[in-house]
Amino acid sequence: MKVIAFARNDLGTGASRRQRIAGLTPGIVYGGTAAPVNISLDHNALYHALKKEAFHSSILDLEVDGKVEQVLLRDFQVHAYKQLVLHADFQRVDAKQKIHVKVPLHFINAEISPAVKLQAGIISHVATELDITCLPGNLPEFVEVDLATLEVGHSIHLADIKLPKGVVAVIHGGEDNPTIATAAVPAGKVEEAAAAPAAAAAPAAPADKK
């Protein structure tokens, strides 16, 4: 995925405001052995790119004044109530050095799982992204979580996920095998199921004598 940008020398709040009025978004490229470079990007192109999931978790080819570098989107700021991207940060990557990044989780086969198909359960996504490390060439756009065998009362944990080659999950909070998804029957359905046998066992009301 390619991103076009231009180096900028006018810095400060006033300069950034003028950039936005002109339809540009200020940004910065940093990392590696080169010095940080302040850049400008076309606002509309950046705004629409940010809507794409892959833009947030892929190696990008950033062209600045004709020179192309491989980067990751590391941060961006948007206006509180306007459809306006205020700033974007990109980090250079080295093909030989591992990167640390979050990638989205894609949940598949929920509709054929026993929890949904046979037990009228609801699957809850405890996590929606995964912290990983890998070489840039091994970076996946997303990681799949297969729910095909999930049953009510059970969970999918990190150890159940097949990670792509060269990808290692980063675990936080001291939990060795965090929960990724769970399956349960909604409270209302549990009450209905419990009430049904009781209703069946209740004696019929005597008929009125005429």
UniProtKB/Swiss-Prot annotation:
Role, per record:
This is one of the proteins that binds to the 5S RNA in the ribosome where it forms part of the central protuberance.
Could you tell me which species this protein originates from? Answer: Herminiimonas arsenicoxydans
A single Gene Ontology MF term assigned here is:
structural constituent of ribosome
InterPro entries per UniProt: Rbsml_bL25/Gln-tRNA_synth_N, Ribosomal_bL25/Gln-tRNA_synth, Ribosomal_bL25_b-dom, Ribosomal_bL25_C, Ribosomal_bL25_long, Ribosomal_bL25_short, Ribosomal_L25_dom, Ribosomal_uL5_bac-type
Which keywords describe this protein according to UniProt? Ribonucleoprotein, Ribosomal protein, RNA-binding, rRNA-binding
Output the superkingdom of the source species.
Answer: Bacteria
Q: What is this protein called?
A: Large ribosomal subunit protein bL25
Question: Could you state one GO cellular component term attached to this entry?
Answer: cytosolic large ribosomal subunit
CDD domains from the entry? Ribosomal_L25_TL5_CTC
A Pfam family annotated for this UniProt entry: Ribosomal_L25p
Q: Which family does it belong to?
A: Belongs to the bacterial ribosomal protein bL25 family. CTC subfamily.
Q: Does the keyword ATP-binding apply?
A: no
Summary of subunit composition and partner proteins = Part of the 50S ribosomal subunit; part of the 5S rRNA/L5/L18/L25 subcomplex. Contacts the 5S rRNA. Binds to the 5S rRNA independently of L5 and L18.
| Biological processes annotated in GO | translation
